[in-house]
Amino acid sequence: MRRNMSVLLAALLALALCLSGCGSNGTSSAAEPAADSAPAEETQEPEEAEVPEGSEEASDQEKADEAAALIDAIYVQQRTDETDAQCAAAKAAWDALTDAQKELVEGEEADPDYFGRDTGDASKDDPRNQDEIRENELLVVSFGTSFNDSRVADIKGIEDALAAANPDWSVRRAFTAQIIINHVQARDDEKIDNMQQALDRAAANGVKNLVVQPTHLMHGAEYDELMEAVEAYEDRFESVKVAEPLLGEVGTDATVINADKKAVAEAVTAEAVKDAGYDSLNAAKEDGAAFVFLGHGTSHTAKVSYSQMQTQMGDLGYDNVFIGTVEGEPEETACEAVMEAVAEGGYRKVILRPLMVVAGDHANNDMAGDDEDSWKSMFTASGKFDSVDAQIAGLGQIPAIQDLYVAHTAAVME
């Protein structure tokens, strides 16, 4: 009996110890995760804020827009006291952009080509803005171009010819397009005088005899503006004379043609035929090739000059030579009209070439560009021709044209 009681007590004690251990283990197991969770919350890495989709592009666009605004600010025709600083700021903003950001530049006038297009080596040009001018100055006035190679070949080519022919005269340069002056200054750090700057420079250097030789094609609106600028300075010099533009006097109608237009017609045609690889204009005609010389066009009364040039081509027997204009003024020089005339003549090959002193923006883009509204693209899209080629060369680089300017200058110096 006593033994049974001992066994029973031992069993109860073992059960109690088991229950006590199980309770202790359960409490400990529940407490460990709770203890571990506290430090986990303290050391957890903060989540990164989500970047809105497109925010990086927006930042790039903002920088591109800033550069575009600075470019638009210097795309103006008036020079101010802030112009030099604005040109520098526009270039600095462009240089700070990445290549990807530069492709986003788009303003009223600004685009990636403003600073990004390679137009040649500006260091080959001479702005001819030096002081130390002698008593006799020959000021060569051009509209201007931002295409470096064309500026050197066409404008500098004329200036060099005039300087060689007039060694006793100081040859200087002026552009009438401030927009172009700003472009060249901002991009290439080349400073070219506008008309006011050039005339002020001449007066400040004690010039007595001033001869102005415009490189303009005709007596158009730009020539009129040049005359107004010169007249305002006439009392600053002992004598002021202005030579004829390339095509000379305008004349009264399309049938009245002067010797200058004949000389230009012969010179540009001969150069175009040679560059196209033909021995003569007749050889080109037999090959079914026509030449289209493209001018700017104008609403000015001087637009009759283009009609006179077409008449002159006919008088010379140049049946496969046609005159067109970018602006389509006069009407018969519009692209559609010229295309029809070329097609009706039975010509299947077309060679486009500028009837412009400088092969600049109009020649490179409006005439020979890849856009659908360029003359080359429209002639090609018409399907009327087997081939359409473009010769990008200004009149100013043709020796016979340079000689004509020299003759015009000599005429007023006599």
Where are these regions (language model features)?
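Low-complexity, Pro/Thr/Ser/Glu-rich flexible segments characteristic
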Residues: 28-58
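Bacterial signal peptide processing site
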Residues: 23-26
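Beta-rich interaction/scaffold domains
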Residues: 54-119
